[in-house]
Regions:
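Short strand-turn-strand beta-turns centered on an Asx-Gly dipeptide
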Residues: 40, 68-69
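Short polybasic amphipathic segments
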Residues: 35, 63-67
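Short beta-strand scaffold segments in enzyme catalytic cores
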Residues: 33-37, 46-48, 56-57
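Oxyanion/phosphate-interacting regions
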Residues: 115-190
């Protein structure tokens, strides 16, 4: 888990060799390797491998995000149903009040959460505590799949804040824009 020494460099590689450490230790399959490349402070390339699932997600400049070579896209705007789900942190029951009409799931890997939102399986995800190495690759993949990232408070989110502080300064929601707007009304920080 690290970034290059100079966060102001034109190119910065960001590596998390084991995202989802607790899942890995528990013998659960939801963990992965995450590699991102920032170009002038913006995610330009991302690769997330979920080895036990046989899934490799990636994004490169000017191309759609892919899962094992097949293009992926976030869930389209629509009405929510009871089987729809969002990803949440494992400690959400202590930190948030969530009034979501579908299901909530904790995957145990922030990288996997970005991937499931990017491929349209999850409507969105709430991410409350993360370092740059947890999100750099996922941001590139999510954005290439048509997704967005916004602060839970509604303030504009900028990855440069995470680069400077090495961690999120407030929770974020990821997904398609209309889903994020609805989720923000249904998730309250305690």
């Amino acid at each position: 888990e690290q970034t290059s020494q100079d966060a102001n460099a034109e190119y910065v590689w960001v590596l998390d060799p084991l995202d989802g450490t607790a899942s890995f230790v528990a013998g659960l399959p939801m963990w992965g390797i995450s590699l991102g490349l920032l170009h002038q402070g913006h995610p330009s390339f991302g690769m997330i491998e979920l080895p036990l699932l046989g899934d490799c997600y990636w994004a490169e400049p000017g191309r759609p995000a892919k899962l094992n070579g097949t293009p992926i896209h976030v869930a389209a705007p629509r009405e929510w149903e009871g089987e729809d789900w969002i990803a949440i942190p494992s400690n959400s029951h202590r930190r948030f009040t969530i009034d979501f009409p579908g299901k909530v799931r904790s995957l145990g890997s922030i990288a996997a959460e970005f991937c499931y939102v990017a491929r349209g399986k999850a409507l969105g995800a709430l991410i409350s505590r993360a370092a740059l190495w947890d999100i750099a690759a996922g941001v590139a993949i999510l954005q290439a799949a048509g997704g967005q990232i916004e602060s839970l408070s509604g303030a504009q989110w900028d990855i440069n804040t995470t680069i400077t502080s090495s961690a999120l300064n407030e929770p974020i929601i990821i997904g398609e824009a209309s889903h994020i707007t609805k989720l923000r009304r249904q998730i309250q920080q305690r």
